[in-house]
Amino acid sequence: MRIIPLSIVLLAFSAPAVAQVIGKTFPEMEAETVEDKVVSVPQDTKGKFTLLGLAYSKKSEDELNGWFEPIFYKFIQKTTGLMAGFGYDVNVYFIPMFTGINAAATGTAKRKALKKVDPQLLPYILFYKGELKRFKEELDFEKKDIPYFFVLDQNGKIVFATSGAFSESKLDQIEEVIE
């Protein structure tokens, strides 16, 4: 009988800590495109819903890459024909974060992205170089090996947060918030 209550307690405490950030304004972050254009989040994204995917380790970046294709087809690719009016008007950015000693690798990562990433995706990838501590504290980044996703409303307030590998259920939850 003790197994059931213990498993319920463990399940309750395993809920993503990122849920604690809902309602907060996303902290200011300046990041760059592969062409070195600076984008300030959330300042430059106001007026539209914004989906952000952040990763700050090689392993989490690999998981972040698993989100590229499904998010591209769901939110970025423009529909044509009969479905032309049913696309989403949303900002989408995938942000690998280069901090500490890894900050020096930002330029190399940009050049690598130019060579290896589908050109259609490049405008949606931002490179952050700077400190991590503030974001870890304000966004409840607890595990470095997973990516974190945030949906911001038109004013930059976090209205949804999730983390980890891609799943259809997570994508459905994001879509519900954006609709």
Describe the function of each predicted region.
Residues 1-5:
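Positively charged n-region of N-terminal signal peptides that target proteins for export
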Residues 6-7, 17:
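Cleavable N-terminal signal peptides
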Residues 18-42, 66:
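N-terminal "domain-start" segment that seeds a small globular fold
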Residues 44-68:
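Short active-site neighborhood of thiol/selenol oxidoreductases, capturing the structured segment around
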Residues 60-118:
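Structural microenvironment flanking redox-active thiols in thiol-disulfide oxidoreductases
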Residues 101-145:
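Thioredoxin-like thiol-disulfide oxidoreductase module
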Residues 134-137, 144-179:
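Thiol-/selenol-based redox modules, centered on thioredoxin-like
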